[in-house]
Amino acid sequence: MASHPVFIDLSLDEQVQELRKFFKKLGAEISSEKSNKGVEDDLHKIIGVCEVCFKDGEPAQIDGILNSIVSIMITIPLDRGENIVLAYCEKMTKAPNQPLAKVCLQSLWRLFNNLDTASPLRYHVYYHLVQVAKQCDQVLEVFTGVDQLKSQFANCPPSSEQMQKLYRLLHDVTKDTNLELSSKVMIELLGTYTADNACVAREDAMKCIVTALADPNTFLLDPLLSLKPVRFLEGDLIHDLLSIFVSDKLPSYVQFYEDHKEFVNSQGLNHDQNMKKMRLLTFMQLAESYPEMSFDTLTKELQINDDEVEPFVIEVLKTKLVRARLDQANRKVHISSTMHRTFGAPQWEQLRDLLQAWKENLSSVREGLTNVSSAQLDLARTQKLIH
């Protein structure tokens, strides 16, 4: 989101005086006279009544008023500005409609970007602007990913507790519109826990698992099992379900659903979507072992009809998780490569062997080129002596 620098031509005293008069004229319970306690008290009074401009004002006019308030706020020293900033942030979350919420979002973004990057107040402003962004469907304008988020606070990292609170909020505001991003946020959240406090993260761990399972674009689920809060769920149904999605095939999920249908539904998971995902994961697992699969094998393993095989394979190829070729004439699928569902010691060993083979092949090529080069030099010398 673009942000413009804050600057007002009037002096602080003149700005305060004008703001007091403006809100007094709108009917707010505020004196038009400056406080003898200083500009900070003036700001407290002004912020306390600033929502009255939401009633009848035009968005452009309101934006100008809020801009003036922000221009005064950023002059307050850090040690005396926390309560003022927090009070202002709370007011900005009270916008009565979407157009005004956008104005409030712009104001908070302006405040965020004009605070010193080392100011701990930036965290509080950002938390509230995410709340406001949700109100006006602008979340992706202020949050595009975890890396971007961390860079925002590079000069003043929030505490683990603050980041946990922020990650939970970001999960809530993205889960209905961007499951992939929401899933990444939850994984980051679980990563903030240590062995000492992972046991208290049960609810967060369950949300993380459910979000990852529900995300149609998340297929590599194995890393979740290594997260400490997830380990504490071992023996619970949600952990059993995750384990099925990590390494089991479709029949295991079907059996689990038959035994625990109420549990799956209570987690907000869609059975049809689960079946679709498990079919794809099962296909990937089969592709790891079989470079060639018949249509009959796929109808049996994936529990689909014969006429559904080709459309299914085409959908799999669109994900780019598997490279394959359909052979309609012989009713077969030829596999070129596939992403592994799990990546453990066997896969690392396989990768090591592959790289070692490449290294040996490159050495052979280099040796061959050296021999060719030497032969050409010898030939050139011989021809030179003859002439």
Curated annotation (Swiss-Prot):
Protein name per Swiss-Prot or TrEMBL: Eukaryotic translation initiation factor 3 subunit M
Similarity field: Belongs to the eIF-3 subunit M family.
Biological function: Component of the eukaryotic translation initiation factor 3 (eIF-3) complex, which is involved in protein synthesis of a specialized repertoire of mRNAs and, together with other initiation factors, stimulates binding of mRNA and methionyl-tRNAi to the 40S ribosome. The eIF-3 complex specifically targets and initiates translation of a subset of mRNAs involved in cell proliferation.
Pfam families reported for this sequence: eIF3m_C_helix (PF18005), PCI (PF01399)
Domain PCI positions: 181-340
GO biological process entries: formation of cytoplasmic translation initiation complex
GO MF: translation initiation factor activity
One CC-aspect GO term: Golgi apparatus
Localization (cell): Cytoplasm; Golgi apparatus
Subunit structure: Component of the eukaryotic translation initiation factor 3 (eIF-3) complex. The eIF-3 complex interacts with pix.
Source organism phylogeny: Eukaryota, Metazoa, Ecdysozoa, Arthropoda, Hexapoda
Alphabetical keyword list: Cytoplasm, Golgi apparatus, Initiation factor, Protein biosynthesis
Main localization (coarse): cytoplasm
UniProt cross-references to SMART domains, sorted A to Z: PINT (SM00088)
